């Protein structure tokens, strides 16, 4: 089971280590709000792809307000000069949701080498710049262990190196207990758009076992 399902979704729950990316309560309008959340994430991820966004957490404490927390490696790109970019984003979300109370919080990810989303995006960017996939994967593994990672697994799929036949290459270092629910495993994917086609990147990072002070929502 742990080998097949998404490592993040497998651990989502009030008593487990992972939390939901959307926090809201709606009886009749759940579908509408859910689609809105998807559009907001799409707007942020596509508009600020150079910022290397790790996570977008959307909270709706009431029917009149929305709080968006963005974790990114380069928060200055999202903020912009004198806050110009974040003001544009706020106005776009106000128009999309028809809410006047829109709050956006930007958080910098300091240990980005053990953040699966940022690591996957970094590998994808290197592949787009024609860096060897083996070099990109090995560099990511070494950097992860330097920042406290206890295990990492990286997979690249597609026409690697411009080969005629698509294949999958992967590397694994350290521990990766996918079946252990208390294991803090971060998982993410990314896509590299190359001249040979799309290359898919998957990253699993094991940060240690769950403890109460490590839990986040």
Curated annotation (Swiss-Prot):
UniProtKB keywords: Ribonucleoprotein, Ribosomal protein, RNA-binding, rRNA-binding
Single biological process term from Gene Ontology: translation
Recorded superkingdom: Bacteria
UniProt xrefs under InterPro entries: KH_dom (IPR004087), KH_dom-like_a/b (IPR015946), KH_dom_type_2 (IPR004044), KH_sf_prok-type (IPR009019), Ribosomal_S3_C_sf (IPR036419), Ribosomal_uS3_bac-typ (IPR005704), Ribosomal_uS3_C (IPR001351), Ribosomal_uS3_CS (IPR018280)
Alphabetized GO MF terms: mRNA binding; rRNA binding; structural constituent of ribosome
Gene Ontology CC terms, in alphabetical order: cytosolic small ribosomal subunit
Domain (KH type-2) ranges: 40-110
Keyword RNA-binding: yes
Quaternary structure (record): Part of the 30S ribosomal subunit. Forms a tight complex with proteins S10 and S14.
Stated family: Belongs to the universal ribosomal protein uS3 family.
Function: Binds the lower part of the 30S subunit head. Binds mRNA in the 70S ribosome, positioning it for translation.
Protein name per UniProt: Small ribosomal subunit protein uS3
Species the sequence originates in: Rickettsia rickettsii (strain Sheila Smith)
């Amino acid at each position: 089971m742990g080998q097949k399902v998404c490592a993040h979704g497998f651990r989502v729950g009030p008593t487990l280590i992972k939390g939901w990316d959307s926090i809201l309560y709606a009886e009749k309008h759940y579908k509408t709000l859910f689609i809105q959340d998807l559009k907001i994430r799409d707007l942020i991820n596509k508009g600020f792809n150079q910022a290397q966004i790790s996570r977008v957490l959307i909270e709706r404490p009431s029917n009149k307000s929305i709080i968006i927390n963005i974790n990114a490696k380069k928060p200055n790109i999202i903020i912009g000069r004198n806050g110009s970019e974040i003001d544009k984003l706020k106005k776009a979300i106000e128009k999309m949701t028809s809410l006047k109370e829109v709050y956006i919080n930007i958080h910098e990810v300091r240990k980005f080498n053990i953040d699966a989303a940022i690591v996957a995006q970094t590998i994808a960017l290197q592949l787009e710049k024609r860096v060897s996939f083996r070099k990109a994967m090995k560099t990511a593994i070494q950097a992860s262990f330097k920042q406290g990672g206890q295990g990492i697994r990286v997979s690249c799929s597609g026409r690697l190196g411009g080969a005629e036949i698509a294949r999958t290459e992967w590397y694994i270092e350290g521990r990766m207990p996918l079946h252990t629910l208390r294991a803090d495993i971060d998982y993410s994917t990314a896509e590299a758009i190359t001249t040979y086609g799309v290359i898919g990147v998957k990253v699993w990072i094991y940060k240690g076992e769950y403890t109460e002070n490590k839990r986040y929502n």
